[in-house]
Amino acid sequence: MATIEGIVAREILDSRGNPTVEVEVGLDDGTIARAAVPSGASTGAFEAVELRDGEKDRYLGKGVTQAVSNIEDKIVDELIGYEASEQRLIDQKMLDLDGTDNKSQLGANAILGVSLAVAKAAASAAELNLFRYLGGPNAHLLPVPMMNILNGGAHADSNVDIQEFMIAPIGAPTFREALRSGAEVYHALKSVLKKKDLATGLGDEGGFAPNLPTNAAALDLISEAVEKAGYRLGTDIVFALDVAATEFFENGTYTFEGVEKTAEEMSSYYTKLADAYPIVSIEDPLAEDDWSGWRTLTASVGDRIQIVGDDLFVTNPQRIARGIAENAANSVLVKVNQIGSLTETLDAVDLAHRAGFRCMMSHRSGETEDTTIADLAVATGCGQIKTGAPARSDRVAKYNQLLRIEEELADAARYAGSGAFPRYRSA
């Protein structure tokens, strides 16, 4: 197998105009592969550390030249000569070199950039697609695209509390048709918003970001768009939410729609919402430290709704293990930069799947043209991917990669569809 001959890192811009890390790995057989690291807006307190320079007169303190230097001055010498196929060994070398629990010494953005680029290089050297290299001969499941078509919270300058209102086209026979139906609903929503004199400006992830009287009003608008596009709500198209409740949690209470609420009151709100709309999944419905609230909500509606931990778990196997033990949530959102290495990401997915938890592969609000998560979604067979609206090239790049993968798989491809949400029963 080819060995690592050189590693180059650079500072590039993400989709929000903020710096991020890009890494190129060169092998002794002439292979060169590149990976770029995403960045979040609403970040969990327990995420691995994203190293920023902090120089206020340069990129408002968000530069990543220190992370780049850590790669070129510290990581490179440790990895030269290793076989690129030794992913776990290479990642462990970087973790040992960092020496902290949260990757604060080298930076998760430095470690992850190298980790992903090494995997891509190894796949290329083996003349395999990344999804096949990571997932093996049985990787064949195309995920349901969880399309964030209306943005609120930290992803938009609007008065809507819930961060993401997603549509999931579970009734389509293929990923290609699922993407088409999602795009058609997205365009129909723009038409609905215009007709009602509501703003059609876009949030970070390509979804519309109007001011609305209530959060439920967003679901009403999307329901109208689904009908306008000619699809059946609850059968062809269902809803999913990312509440990002930590963003409006303070001093033990949730300030939601201008009113302070307890965890029990928030849980009651979600239950009523799920009774009124075809909601299959709710992400971060409660704060990242509200373990008792998570347990209560999961016990209450977890038999019919996917309860997803993002800030709760931060793709960290230790926190996921606690969630499994305490029956807090029943699904894990998977973000490679939350944990900071490919090996740990795959370990997190494996742990969740062995416990019967579902997984949803996810982008970040600050993205690049890198499409690694599309391949990861297929490689891990998670059946769900969250990568924004069908707009903005940083989001669409992942969907387009999945189209290519489906084409490559040909007759072996299977679309997850409604099987991705076994708890949901359509009306």
From Swiss-Prot:
Kindly give the CDD domains that the UniProt entry links to this protein: enolase
The uppermost taxa in this organism's lineage are: Bacteria, Bacillati, Actinomycetota, Actinomycetes, Micromonosporales
Organism of provenance? Salinispora tropica (strain ATCC BAA-916 / DSM 44818 / JCM 13857 / NBRC 105044 / CNB-440)
Q: Which residues bind Mg(2+) per the record?
A: D242, E283, D310
Record SUPFAM superfamilies: Enolase C-terminal domain-like, Enolase N-terminal domain-like
| Pathway note | Carbohydrate degradation; glycolysis; pyruvate from D-glyceraldehyde 3-phosphate: step 4/5
Q: Which cofactor does it need?
A: Mg(2+)
Q: What is its EC number?
A: 4.2.1.11
Q: What's one GO-annotated cellular component?
A: extracellular region
Which sequence ranges form a coiled-coil region, renumbered to this chain? none
Query: What's the protein name?
Result: Enolase
Which example biological process does GO assign this protein?
Answer: glycolytic process
Task: Check the record and name the HAMAP family matching this protein.
Answer: Enolase (MF_00318)
Name of the gene encoding the protein in the UniProt record: eno
